[in-house]
Amino acid sequence: MSMFLDTAKIKVKAGNGGDGMVAFRREKYVPNGGPWGGDGGRGGNVVFVVDEGLRTLMDFRYNRHFKADSGEKGMTKGMHGRGAEDLRVRVPQGTTVRDAETGKVLTDLIEHGQEFIVAHGGRGGRGNIRFATPKNPAPEISENGEPGQERELQLELKILADVGLVGFPSVGKSTLLSVITSAKPKIGAYHFTTIVPNLGMVRTQSGESFAVADLPGLIEGASQGVGLGTQFLRHIERTRVILHIIDMSASEGRDPYEDYLAINKELESYNLRLMERPQIIVTNKMDMPESQENLEEFKKKLAENYDEFEELPAIFPISGLTKQGLATLLDATAELLDKTPEFLLYDESDMEEEVYYGFDEEEKAFEISRDDDATWVLSGEKLMKLFNMTNFDRDESVMKFARQLRGMGVDEALRARGAKDGDLVRIGKFEFEFVD
């Protein structure tokens, strides 16, 4: 069974902030000591760290839940609780991280050591020392810690290779990779010998080097999931140059030109941008008897279907078995790579905008709905944040929360919707009566 895994869905939960403390200074010779409760510590973030030693997402096959520690509670003497350590999760180079709910790309991790916070820890709640005022010098008010961010993520590994080998099954991609690199892919005289991508490094006679990926053979309908389908088509996306391998011996009764058209159709159907990558046509198995005649026919059909002003793709006849033409092919590939820039994998519409947490006057602070039992239901990100950080065990904290609701315009909005004195209002699992 293959141990290669290139997709995974996981859940991450950052740590909650520690609760603030209500405490008072009681020391001999210090009359009217005042508040002395400290703030809670910050919750730990969940951080992805790129590790070049990893080659697969196999670590996420059985471990799909990642939870960072919460911050410690505030202490007496105004001391802060200790902040939690970040939970650092290693991922391989080439990992794309998406929000599973929205489908938006959060980050594309390609550099060794690159870090990205996928879930932010909650800030610590404030202790009562923070709420002292001339009017209320000894407040019994504290905040709960802010809940840590929680989300479901879709991970997708797209291997880092400069050059991708594509073609129908059994055209000789694995054989080619084995003779131009030190990679040892599985080679056999049957279809789909390669069932996972293989990666190898090429070094040309002139000393240039580049990474080559041998991808599992494509068949018609691959972009719709036929055969190995799109399972490995994603790995072509990071390549800058495509070597299109064609079996010129036509040993299985196939038409090399029809094969060429069919594979390009699958690449275009999967992702139109793949056709922006320059292609080199590699006609393999030229050591076979019928290959030269088939090559001439292939060139003729190719020329007939290209506009006179279009530049025909470069064609390199080779034999992976006898190594005929390999040096010329590799030099041409290196030269093409030198003048081919990186391709943008995602545009701005694919990426999730970076969120800055702060007050936004245009942000809708709360929403009002009505349940089937006639209870008014309050929701909204800003309102729920205040609710979760309120310590309902302290009367002063409850009154502070009521003032915050009035300040946000909740009372006026409820009246405008028709709420009457004594109506039930629910926030989360907490219910109270509306007082007009």
UniProtKB/Swiss-Prot annotation:
Q: Where in the cell is it found?
A: Cytoplasm
Q: Does Cytoplasm show up as a keyword for this record?
A: yes
What this protein needs as a cofactor is: Mg(2+)
Obg domain location is: 2-160
Please state the Enzyme Commission number of this protein.
3.6.5.-
Matching Pfam families, A to Z?
Answer: DUF1967, GTP1_OBG, MMR_HSR1
* Gene Ontology annotations of biological process type: ribosome biogenesis
Q: Which domain of life is it from?
A: Bacteria
Q: For the OBG-type G domain, which residue ranges apply?
A: 161-338
Q: Where is the OCT domain?
A: 358-436
Alphabetized UniProt keyword annotations: Cytoplasm, GTP-binding, Hydrolase, Magnesium, Metal-binding, Nucleotide-binding
What Gene Ontology molecular function terms does this protein carry? GTP binding; GTPase activity; magnesium ion binding
A GO cellular component annotated for this chain's UniProt record is: cytoplasm
Main localization is cytoplasm
> Which positions in this protein are listed as binding GTP?
167-174, 192-196, 214-217, 284-287, 319-321
- How does this chain assemble? Monomer.
- Write out the similarity annotation: Belongs to the TRAFAC class OBG-HflX-like GTPase superfamily. OBG GTPase family.
Record's function text: An essential GTPase which binds GTP, GDP and possibly (p)ppGpp with moderate affinity, with high nucleotide exchange rates and a fairly low GTP hydrolysis rate. Plays a role in control of the cell cycle, stress response, ribosome biogenesis and in those bacteria that undergo differentiation, in morphogenesis control.
Which named protein is this? GTPase Obg
- What species was this sequence derived from? Streptococcus pneumoniae serotype 2 (strain D39 / NCTC 7466)
Query: Which gene codes for it?
Result: obg
